[in-house]
Amino acid sequence: MTDQDSTYRPRSPDLSTFQSSIPPAVNSPIYPLASPLAHRASYDASPFFAPQYQQPPAPLGRVPQQYIPPFVDPNSPLSPDMARRSSRLARATEVAPMPEVSYAQPVLSEEPQQLPPPPPQPNPVASIEVKTKFPVARIKRIMQADEDVGKVAQVTPIAVSKALELFMISLVTKAAKEARDRNSKRVTATHLKQAVVKDEVLDFLADIIAKVPDQPAGGRKHDDDGSDQNEQPKRKRGGRRPKDDSD
């Protein structure tokens, strides 16, 4: 290879004969190509330094103005009309008041408290023991003597004896209450009569108690003393006759 090929470098093209058909945007001075300012003059920096297009600001919108009613002299003749008009406008724009909501407290139905049942009262008849029983054999003979009864079962006289016993206890207990109310220490026929009269269950004894005389006025004194009305006075025992003095 030759020295020219070994030291090869590209040659700059010759632009002296090239003429641009587009006129330059900015009139710049023409420098000869041999001048050192020729390369700098060919650089067009007008696009970078040209002022950019700025959009004109939009016109400001019209600010709404609040309507202020003109001042009206209260002494002028137009003031009543204006007042009525203002009152109508005020009533039209007035918001109806909301109805008051009242909270109704729920009523709780209170259940009545159930009282405990009272303890069963002991039966006074059950606590009384009768030592002398009604004779069952005699009750049986009395029942068999009745023509309407005829034969009697073995258990029947026993049940009748127990029923008579309970009836006697009930009647005597009521008569004893009458005696206590009258401050008497004994139960008499008069007390039995008062007990039968006050109890409707014992009305079947009305014919029997009708034969019992009412208690006399002085009977209360005998009851208080604990004496019996039917009790007869005791006879005094006679003593020995005094011996006559013999002469």
From Swiss-Prot:
Asked if the keyword Cytoplasm belongs to this entry, the reply reads no
State any GO BP term from the record: transcription by RNA polymerase II
Primary residence: nucleus
Provide an example Pfam family for this protein. CBFD_NFYB_HMF
The Basic and acidic residues compositionally biased stretches are: 1-12
| GO CC term (a single one) | nucleus
Positions with biased composition (Polar residues) = 13-22
Q: Name the InterPro entries for this protein.
A: CBFA_NFYB_domain, Histone-fold, Transcr_DNA_Rep_Reg
Region Disordered: start and end of each range? 1-31, 48-82, 212-247
Q: Quaternary structure?
A: Forms the NCT transcriptional regulatory complex with nctB and mot1.
What is the consequence of disrupting this locus? Results in a reduction in growth rate. Leads to a multidrug-resistance phenotype, including the azoles (itraconazole, voriconazole and posaconazole), as well as the salvage therapeutic amphotericin B and terbinafine, an agent used in the treatment of chronic and allergic disease. Also leads to transcriptional derepression of cdr1B and its over-production. Also results in a notable increase in the immunogenic properties of Aspergillus fumigatus, but does not result in loss of virulence.
* UniProt keywords, alphabetically: DNA-binding, Nucleus, Transcription, Transcription regulation
| TM ranges | none
Family, per entry: Belongs to the NC2 alpha/DRAP1 family.
Is the Cytoplasm keyword given for this protein?
A: no
Q: Which GO terms describe its molecular function?
A: core promoter sequence-specific DNA binding; protein heterodimerization activity; RNA polymerase II general transcription initiation factor activity
The gene name on file is nctA
Q: What does this protein do?
A: Part of the NCT transcriptional regulatory complex that acts as a key regulator of ergosterol biosynthesis and the azole exporter cdr1B. The NCT complex binds the promoters of genes linked to azole susceptibility, and especially represses the expression of cdr1B transporter.
Where is the protein found, in the record's own terms?
Nucleus
Name of this chain's protein: NCT transcriptional regulatory complex subunit A
